[in-house]
Amino acid sequence: MKILVAVKRVVDYAVKVRVRPDRTGVETASVKMSMNPFCEIAVEEALRLRESGAATEVVAATVGPSQSADTLRTALAMGADRAVHVLHDPDPSRPLLPLAVAKILRALALQENPGLVILGKQAIDDDCNQTGQMLAGLLNWPQGTFASKVILNKEKATVEREVDGGIETISLDLPAVITTDLRLNQPRYATLPNIMKAKSKVIKKVTPEDLDVDIRSDMEVVEVTEPPKRKAGVILSSVDELVDRLKNEARVL
């Protein structure tokens, strides 16, 4: 069985995000980029399923500019068998919406015919948490979201997911779509030999037009601004002063 894994290139989680001077979006020039952490978990889970014998091939896919190939090479270095790059140069004022990404992944799924599609539950740049659900809807496949455990056999996938007050266990007929939670696994580090091998591997390149997918966005970003800076804290000398400030400044009493 083949597993298709979607990955995304994002600003590294350790980088302090800054807004562009023209306020059209987040500054990405000369900024460290990396694979979305939830996507790393998705790749790791696919590799573990292949190593257990439940799957035979892992195909990584991404949508983005030419630089996104680095993210695919990370997936290849981790152990993915093949990679597909859907080339798309982003427009900050017309970002690629989750529905457009889901349509692209649907087209890839119809081409690759996987038994399972695994995605991170969300990306840390936009936190939409929509693509996996939309993809399942477009494919009319069952879905298991926020997976914290996945057990796969030839015909079904058993998924444990954390819900309010406990753990829910669901059974999905294959093919299916699964989105990963942070608790699912701990991604492996790519070894230096595998990193070097990944650099020489051929990545298949296609465009949304090749897949006959319309990715035009109806949403326009008007402006992006940084959150207001927090005021410095004040040390109060007495309870009376605290009550006075709550009453006259905060006006909560």
Curated annotation (Swiss-Prot):
One of its GO terms (molecular function) is electron transfer activity. It is found in: Mitochondrion matrix. Its cofactor is FAD; AMP. It comes from the Eukaryota. Pfam families: ETF (PF01012). Its main location: mitochondrion. The keyword Electron transport applies. One of its GO terms (cellular component) is mitochondrion. GO terms for biological process: fatty acid beta-oxidation using acyl-CoA dehydrogenase. CDD domains: ETF_beta (cd01714). InterPro entries: ET-Flavoprotein_bsu_CS (IPR000049), ETF_a/b_N (IPR014730), ETF_b (IPR012255), ETF_beta_N (IPR033948), Rossmann-like_a/b/a_fold (IPR014729). Binds 1 FAD per dimer. Keywords: Electron transport, FAD, Flavoprotein, Mitochondrion, Transit peptide, Transport. The electron transfer flavoprotein serves as a specific electron acceptor for several dehydrogenases, including five acyl-CoA dehydrogenases, glutaryl-CoA and sarcosine dehydrogenase. It transfers the electrons to the main mitochondrial respiratory chain via ETF-ubiquinone oxidoreductase (ETF dehydrogenase). Belongs to the ETF beta-subunit/FixA family. Heterodimer of an alpha and a beta subunit. PANTHER family: ELECTRON TRANSFER FLAVOPROTEIN BETA-SUBUNIT, ELECTRON TRANSFER FLAVOPROTEIN SUBUNIT BETA. This is Electron transfer flavoprotein subunit beta, mitochondrial.
